[in-house]
Amino acid sequence: YSSATYTMDSLAQGYRGISTYNSVLNGNLKEFVDVCYPELYYMDQNRYAFWPNAEDNFLAAFTGVRYLLSKSGDLDSSKYELMQQFGGIYLYRNVQEAATARFYVNTISEDSLKELCNEENRETLLENSLALEDGREIEDLSDLEEISDAQKKSSVVLNAPEKDSCITGTVSARADGYVLCMIPYENGWTVSVDGEEVETEKGDLGFLAFPVKEGEHQLTITFHAPGLKAGVGASIVCWIIYFGMLGYGRRRKRKAAVS
């Protein structure tokens, strides 16, 4: 899996890979890494990578990684099940259930997550509750509520997107709660539940979250680049001014030539 990081095999083979993503760091996602998985940092704190920690299959499942490509044929079978071999490449399946979105009834505050999270208990915290700005304050792991049957039996399914700016899906919620999507939280995302827009929140410090009521729901998650409409409008105005100045200059030249 480390070789794929450098060769970007996902681009060559036509699938959506997560090994390499080159951009300015998302500040919210960086905060999640700082608090929950600082070992993801690679070389310095301006970049982080999954592959050095790929054997942590809880992290893989939490972020929606179902399969792993590796040149090693002897990965820990309690974490990754060998599915098939293609020449020198081995395909493994994560034995933990991986999802790109999940449902929570339990919540804790962001401050509680920051205060309590460490390498020993982060899996318990992330699996049990969703951290929200106005979530429930706790002082110790013993203050966590038990995972209810409603939380266990609820489900979220996100469909493979037909275009990058729009994702659809469904929620089967056995109680009022929240959906957490493995989408970095940032301005520009809007969420509609059954056609009605709902307020988005920052979940687990770095991801997109939103509330849903008990029942069966249809989801639409859409991204609009912040400032795009204003930028397009300003560009149109500038072009109008530019062409107007060109036309004015040409008319002046014609008048000067005639006189």
List the model feature ranges, each with a label:
Residues 129-259:
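Active-site-proximal, structured, solvent-exposed surfaces of multi-pass membrane proteins
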